[in-house]
Amino acid sequence: MAIRILPENEIKQVASSFQNPPLLFSSPQNLYARRAQRLRQLAENHPFSDYLLFAADVVEAQNLIFAENPLEKTEFTFNQLRPLDIKHWPRSAKWREYLSALLAEIKPRANEQMIGTIDCLEKASSEELERLADKLLVQEYAQVASDKAVFIWAALSLYWVQLTQFIPHHAIMENAEDLHTCPVCNSVPVASVVQFGSNQGLRYLHCSLCESEWNVVRAKCTVCDQSKELEYWGIDTDKETVKAETCGDCHSYLKTVYQEKDPYVDPVADDLASIFLDIEMEEKQFSRSGLNPFVFPAE
């Protein structure tokens, strides 16, 4: 799957003709504030409220760090195919600055176990931190302790989200192949989002790293592209803002959040808060195909 950044003279032409739905880029100016608010809302009377509130603290720290130390705009040469590909992008040391700031922000509120994790990361060498980041980015999650992974990923994501702001945002997908991973950075999604507003009813996958969204047609598996064995599962609630889409062909599942049911849903926050749905899917022998940045596979 490739994306193409349109020159100015093509933008109006494309707007008046049929094209694939555009890529959507998150704005860090409001992404983190909205997510933190949603996490705190979902934490009310939740069995895992403490962890949801911890996640909100991390997101608020991302927001603060972005405001105080934004990534300086640099002229980049972007490839057409996944311009910020995690496997090839020469990331700078800026993400480690973000990690240090994140740890410093969270430490005063951390419990004893978390302080041990923070101390370990603060003492780690640059080489060790880069090694751990490499492992996470190529999905070798078992090589990184899950408590460390949350902080490292939060710093990497803050870095990658800002990189997307330097890509001209009039970009389209050239084809519909290999849609399971992000066309911008090649990371896996956290969940699907069924949109409302101008994109009413369209399904987008939301990237777990750079927070971009790309369109994938509904009623087909986001992993194997099959459509015959799809089923949808939800927890019994009034709104059912979150459902799991399971595929009987490849035995994977990915959750979907519905903006039309609740305009304040957030793919990361609502996916995390619906962890009991994950437990049900695992009991039914389905494997999660996405990644929530606050729930890494255990060692």
From Swiss-Prot:
Keyword ATP-binding: no
Pfam families with a match to the protein in the record: FdhE_C, FdhE_central, FdhE_N
Subcellular location: Cytoplasm
Principal location listed in the UniProt entry: cytoplasm
One function term, GO molecular function aspect: ferric iron binding
Functional summary from the UniProt entry: Necessary for formate dehydrogenase activity.
Family: Belongs to the FdhE family.
Name this polypeptide is given: Protein FdhE homolog
Species in which this protein is naturally found: Actinobacillus succinogenes (strain ATCC 55618 / DSM 22257 / CCUG 43843 / 130Z)
Gene of this entry: fdhE
